[in-house]
Amino acid sequence: MKLNKYIDHTLLKQDAKKKQIDSLLSEAREYDFASVCVNPTWVEHAKKGLEGTDVKVCTVVGFPLGATTSAVKAFETKEAIQNGADEIDMVINVGALKSGNLALVESDIRAVVEASGDKLVKVIIEACLLTDQEKIVVCQLAQKAGADFVKTSTGFSTGGATIADVRLMRETVGSDMGVKAAGGARSYADALAFVEAGATRIGTSAGVAILKGELADGDY
């Protein structure tokens, strides 16, 4: 198994400096990760820094709260793609889901899917805030709206990915969608366990440590 190609090498901290982003890009080139995941302000820089590689540029939309309007999320998506993004990780409207407004949750996801054209869309469900039934429902809505992946977490709420959540999400979407585990993978064994539970992508800032067989600091 080429575990490196499961990893979205991630730096989403609001105080990330250019030299830290450059280090992220250098590591991504060296280890040939699936993608780097950066905030929208760094997309153009990341695209240039990864020229000549097959490492994708992933960015986030409606991040981290998911509480912007669908029109804003669609605009963010279009601009990110214009700037070079290959993949979009969007946050659902958690409040709408909790309120039972499933039509809004679905249309919100669909707005981003439609704005993304042929680019990959991953739907962050923020599983730590949801009941198991809500997790099932929102995964079904993401599938119905045409998204490519469901993703556990932003890394900015009360918890990251769990094996149980990844397994439940995989059981819900079947083999038709990807499942991304974000947060929670701090070692090679952690990453492997997520893959065995059904993850096809792992979002982590610890990709290098994981591949080296080290235990990473932090929880994202």
Curated annotation (Swiss-Prot):
It comes from the Bacteria. Pathway: Carbohydrate degradation; 2-deoxy-D-ribose 1-phosphate degradation; D-glyceraldehyde 3-phosphate and acetaldehyde from 2-deoxy-alpha-D-ribose 1-phosphate: step 2/2. The active site is at 89 (proton donor/acceptor), 151 (schiff-base intermediate with acetaldehyde), 180 (proton donor/acceptor). Its EC number is 4.1.2.4. Pfam families: DeoC. One of its GO terms (biological process) is carbohydrate catabolic process. One of its GO terms (molecular function) is deoxyribose-phosphate aldolase activity. It is found in: Cytoplasm. It is an enzyme of class 4 (lyase). Its main location: cytoplasm. CDD domains: DeoC (cd00959). GO terms for cellular component: cytoplasm. Gene3D superfamilies: Aldolase class I. InterPro entries: Aldolase_TIM, DeoC, DeoC/FbaB/LacD_aldolase, DeoC_typeI. Keywords: Cytoplasm, Lyase, Schiff base. SMART domains: DeoC. It catalyses: 2-deoxy-D-ribose 5-phosphate = D-glyceraldehyde 3-phosphate + acetaldehyde. PANTHER family: DEOXYRIBOSE-PHOSPHATE ALDOLASE. Catalyzes a reversible aldol reaction between acetaldehyde and D-glyceraldehyde 3-phosphate to generate 2-deoxy-D-ribose 5-phosphate. NCBIfam families: deoC (TIGR00126). Belongs to the DeoC/FbaB aldolase family. DeoC type 1 subfamily. HAMAP family: DeoC_type1 (MF_00114). This is Deoxyribose-phosphate aldolase. The gene is deoC.
